[in-house]
Amino acid sequence: METKVGKQKKRSVDSNDDVSKERRPKRAAACRNFKEKPLRISDKSETVEAKKEQNVVEEIVAIQLTSSLESNDDPRPNRRLTDFVLHNSDGVPQPVEMLELGDIFLEGVVLPLGDDKNEEKGVRFQSFGRVENWNISGYEDGSPGIWISTALADYDCRKPASKYKKIYDYFFEKACACVEVFKSLSKNPDTSLDELLAAVARSMSGSKIFSSGGAIQEFVISQGEFIYNQLAGLDETAKNHETCFVENSVLVSLRDHESSKIHKALSNVALRIDESQLVKSDHLVDGAEAEDVRYAKLIQEEEYRISMERSRNKRSSTTSASNKFYIKINEHEIANDYPLPSYYKNTKEETDELLLFEPGYEVDTRDLPCRTLHNWALYNSDSRMISLEVLPMRPCAEIDVTVFGSGVVAEDDGSGFCLDDSESSTSTQSNVHDGMNIFLSQIKEWMIEFGAEMIFVTLRTDMAWYRLGKPSKQYAPWFETVMKTVRVAISIFNMLMRESRVAKLSYANVIKRLCGLEENDKAYISSKLLDVERYVVVHGQIILQLFEEYPDKDIKRCPFVTGLASKMQDIHHTKWIIKRKKKILQKGKNLNPRAGLAHVVTRMKPMQATTTRLVNRIWGEFYSIYSPEVPSEAIHEVEEEEIEEDEEEDENEEDDIEEEAVEVQKSHTPKKSRGNSEDMEIKWNGEILGETSDGEPLYGRALVGGETVAVGSAVILEVDDPDETPAIYFVEFMFESSDQCKMLHGKLLQRGSETVIGTAANERELFLTNECLTVHLKDIKGTVSLDIRSRPWGHQYRKENLVVDKLDRARAEERKANGLPTEYYCKSLYSPERGGFFSLPRNDIGLGSGFCSSCKIKEEEEERSKTKLNISKTGVFSNGIEYYNGDFVYVLPNYITKDGLKKGTSRRTTLKCGRNVGLKAFVVCQLLDVIVLEESRKASNASFQVKLTRFYRPEDISEEKAYASDIQELYYSHDTYILPPEALQGKCEVRKKNDMPLCREYPILDHIFFCEVFYDSSTGYLKQFPANMKLKFSTIKDETLLREKKGKGVETGTSSGILMKPDEVPKEMRLATLDIFAGCGGLSHGLEKAGVSNTKWAIEYEEPAGHAFKQNHPEATVFVDNCNVILRAIMEKCGDVDDCVSTVEAAELVAKLDENQKSTLPLPGQADFISGGPPCQGFSGMNRFSDGSWSKVQCEMILAFLSFADYFRPKYFLLENVKKFVTYNKGRTFQLTMASLLEIGYQVRFGILEAGTYGVSQPRKRVIIWAASPEEVLPEWPEPMHVFDNPGSKISLPRGLHYDTVRNTKFGAPFRSITVRDTIGDLPLVENGESKINKEYRTTPVSWFQKKIRGNMSVLTDHICKGLNELNLIRCKKIPKRPGADWRDLPDENVTLSNGLVEKLRPLALSKTAKNHNEWKGLYGRLDWQGNLPISITDPQPMGKVGMCFHPEQDRIITVRECARSQGFPDSYEFSGTTKHKHRQIGNAVPPPLAFALGRKLKEALYLKSSLQHQS
């Protein structure tokens, strides 16, 4: 019988089969001669559908119940076994090896072999057998599999029962050892025993059974004979050219090796065994003596297993201090042993490590792959060289060090290599290494192994383990100190080993002996005692860790170790707590561990955020309450759900899945309250105030159980679910019903923890909602103290409000300490369906008049949701819009079945950046008539349909027509349709071309089209309107006045349809704006173009971006400085230093500002609007260093940003960021941001917008947070205008709800999506690496987009691109010029470069990992003329996260100008610095069209407030 590779199916093999046809049997040699009973299953046996875990008694029944079509052809059944136990006839669990001594039986669950996912086919049995033999498979796969055979079938053992796990795990480790030895010897049969043991120890280092690499080596030695027998048995089916294990000297050496440690562990075993009498385990030996020997050996094995288990338990319960703490290396003390600071410089293109491996979040480190790394270097996030020594060798909590690396990665061939200066005579490692250059993610830990003359260093990231080869020449001096320290430790080991008793050598003796070493000794430090001691102490943790891992406990506890540990504690080294849980977690770390030692000044030097005391208190209190025992960086753990790509979602994510309801359900009937069973006296207290609309008397006060309940107060109602917190309701009015019941109508007051701000909310703050209900007064459980809070608004009242709030908090703390009831307050209305917190409608609440605004809203919503005829039955109401004959309307495209020349356009959903191909805009029609169905004409709810005539769009004719035509142009036709009213999606206007607005802005935010051509769909011809054709166009209205609803399904708040020309906006309507984190100015440009903003000040940290901002906004004062310094300077200038929390460094930098800079600083009261986007790199999944301390500090920039809002108190505040901002840090940053703005006193609205729906050709989701003062109107969200398929804009809310900011445009929008060809099709040809800044256009603009984006420019700037290296340029030229072409289209061949090197044309790393990474779609990809551009990133490259960056027809990366156009920047916009700087400025910018859309809505809010003031 043979076993296929790994865990594949097994099959029976006749004795006369030619075994040489198989490469190698993948089974053990042990127990081959147990009698096998072949079973022939009748062909007539039927497959029986099994339910989950049926219980059976007979094995043959279980085999039949778990049969499958795949297994019916197998001569011998193969099944999968889980939750199993091997036991003797008495039911006592037994190790697998005990099969040699007696009968062993099985119990567990049997499943079909190949159906891993369908567990419902499992059949449970209590006892099968007996077991005839066992086998080990998976040698060539590198993953051991255990097979157990009965007389009837073979079983693949997958998962043991929990009670059997410890016993089985030991045997499984033996199988692992066999496979690892097989792998190592197959790759290098001539390896030395030391190398073999080291290689196996490394590969098994993740095992939970063994405490160290030394323990693994001991285990492998102890199993030498077992391993030898398994591998020797493989020789019987090996081919001539394959490794012969029987005579392999290393394997024989392993078999015969004696381990004193094992003998010591087995000293309590009474039997002594003469090894010479032992026989191989693959033969049964007759006779009592042989049986005794076999029995004694198995008993020894079991005793050893038990002793290991006891040892593990003892270690875990009596952990020494050295195992609890890791002493941190002090950088200042070791600085003199390292070179002067220098920076890593990469000369070759490097690939992100994350592209090579499957991310392993919450994965045990033993499951990570092992690779080798050559020509490597280590550095921090500033690219400054850093020693591996500063990173702990154990997983520790509260680590403030971050190390990254680069090098050449290659497959681990299993052979060891010496990192010492002189090559070991036993080392067989080749000096030539093939692989690819990569940069690593954060390095989490590292370890050192040594044996004989060899030293091995291995490090771990979250992706893989890396065995280090030789470092790069640049980094070698940094690694030399680490190697020297290891040599010193080895020298000390040798000293101790030479002593008869290790206790003879004290710490002082060892130091003296080190002083006496010869200068040519590799462990030589100095001849001076003080120098030697200093070196040993400051680098002591490496030495201590090596001693900790040493298997000899006498050496581990020798006087030298205790003396060294004492010395290190005496100099007060910091201790890190060692973490026991080996799970992969991503945490924020300090990217600058050697910043204090550097002589090089860097602008990337971290600085703690400058804050006001209010913002500092809110964030500080939160973390002190919710994370008192959690290390600071644990706050920044990133859950798996947060690893989603911020920018580029999977192209196929939701292609065929219709989205669930995306809007928050508007619940106005809260959970039913539970009545009070107690008898209470309830009576009215006061006179009747009036009547309800039903004539019921209204009262202002009532006595309920002795407590006074008044209109405008708050009461507690208990809900049905006893586990829920009792609900609090605001009393709107009270009345007595017609059946004499005393009633209350109230609105739910929601606790902050039940809103989107969650645990960041103040426990005393309640939020009014529109959820209302009517209850009996007897249902009231009590009253609560509620203050409808109001504070005067403005920066001038800030200090006064702080004093009042401080006293209020002190009073609340005192009441809490004295056990008094909580006093609540309310100052905002929470509306989850509108995504925000709004000022209380104080004039409409607590009136006691019988009116409830929430009931009114509910009635209006119900009315709007109805589809019905108007009174005259000549018009239609649908989704709140009234349609009349002659109106121009939008129709969902899927209702138009006849589609002219464009039938059944297929979507390129499988192609990267082809998400929008095939998606259609709304069909524009004119309503001709409302057809009432005859059978329902007399009914009140008559059924009806609408008759429409269709307009065609250019894209309905052809792609060429769409490209060359105006996006607002329509073609009239005679095609008519009769459709249900549900097909209508809003109203629009169709005008004559001459009646179009003179100033047609980009992006389009108006629902206006023009028509001057007739389209005959029967012939496909376009022609001018016939003279007799009568088309009634839209009536032109005064665009400065309010207009009726213009095509939106639902409109609220400021969505009043106001049309305003930017150049006519009065000066007083433009807000004086401060742009923080301004970048090159994308946000400011869009807001200014909308006519709402006048950017007077900007703060930007990076000089090239600041220069670009100044070029494009010459009237603005631009501060190229740290915003923390600027805020400190402003607060100093205003005399508010006491309210400023900042670093000494910030204060020192403020002192260096000149008087001219200080005189131009903005002051509170001068800025009406603050906008900006705090650096997103820490939040973005696109950022390579997102776990580092600089990103952590950047994330804290949100505190400085919020502090600007607190100190200035502008009318409006706008925060934009990447989508991941909502979920980053488990949502806490998002929640605290909104909690801070609410505490300041703002109204707040939150949402996620897709820039692609506002007229750019790329997917780019942005989180937007609006804040408006209590006196202003919060802007509504701009309506998405372009078709774009990019799902995933929902924000999770409590109670399982989701908020979707705007409607999804996948199924229709007013206009089509902007394509790649629309965007860049007119730009001239350029070559790879083009660097000429100014060029001629050479052609006129063709598409509507090109005309708008080019404007009046006559000179093309920044049409420059990065240069591809020689290999990538060859690859680029080989990529076919067609949609969807990428690296997979490269021929599988080698190319010879100009330097003579031979390289693979297809990237090797992609080929090997494609199966697990969606084929790496898009890498080295060409853009599709009809698709969209990929997300604009700061550094386009073919192997990056966004790898589709090749021009559709030219052999190069897309240019700076092409990237700028993809973001919506006009060609007149200038960028500054190098090509890399310009890409960075564009990639970090807010798309101006999105900013324009936001600005238009802000302007509407300002006009609405103005109109309301005029009305009042």
UniProtKB/Swiss-Prot annotation:
Residues 1-22 have a biased composition (Basic and acidic residues). One of its GO terms (molecular function) is DNA binding. The active site is at C1176. Keywords: Chromatin regulator, DNA-binding, Methyltransferase, Nucleus, Repeat, S-adenosyl-L-methionine, Transferase. It catalyses: a 2'-deoxycytidine in DNA + S-adenosyl-L-methionine = a 5-methyl-2'-deoxycytidine in DNA + S-adenosyl-L-homocysteine + H(+). Residues 707-841, 909-1026 form the BAH domain. It is an enzyme of class 2 (transferase). InterPro entries: BAH_dom, BAH_sf, C5-Methyltransferase, C5_DNA_meth_AS, C5_MeTfrase, C5_meth_CS, Cytosine_MeTrfase1_RFD, DNMT1-like. Residues 1071-1505 form the SAM-dependent MTase C5-type domain. Its main location: nucleus. Residues 1-35, 634-678 are annotated as: Disordered. It is found in: Nucleus. GO terms for biological process: DNA methylation-dependent constitutive heterochromatin formation; methylation. Residues 638-662 have a biased composition (Acidic residues). The keyword Signal does not apply. Its EC number is 2.1.1.37. The keyword Nucleus applies. GO terms for cellular component: nucleus. Maintains chromatin CpG methylation that plays a role in genomic imprinting, regulation of embryogenesis and seed viability. Required for proper patterns of CG DNA methylation in dividing cells. Belongs to the class I-like SAM-binding methyltransferase superfamily. C5-methyltransferase family. This is DNA (cytosine-5)-methyltransferase 2. It comes from Arabidopsis thaliana.
